[in-house]
Amino acid sequence: MELKDNPNYFEVKSMLTWDEYFMLQAMISSFKSKDPATKVGSVFVDEKNHQITMGYNGFVAGIDERLLPWGKDKSQPLEHQKYGYVVHSEANAILHAPRSLAGSRCYVTLFPCNECAKLLASSGVKEVIYLSDKHQDTESN
């Protein structure tokens, strides 16, 4: 009897690649962010495709987000903007990693900023896979 003749056999027609799978996990983690404008998620995996850590952007742990501004009007003083309080997804994941990230890959929903790029490099991340880069057409890029 051939395998296909078995009534319990089914053929997988379509399966996610590892890159698709981990990017979907990063996208799901971004939904934990309370930021009304920008939701970013990240997932770090080792060379065996085991998840090491994940993160999303949000205020510093332990701070009541109702007390801080989510505004992003750069004409306002920094204390009235989210930028002085929000920890980026990559930084949150690195801070909560249970082990070394050396040699890992980072899947992130938004191209890392300069500060996060430095953290990624310093943590030994060997590859960054991003979903979008909303600043790619700006003059500073």
Model regions: which residues?
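Zinc-dependent deaminase catalytic domain
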Residues: 1-141
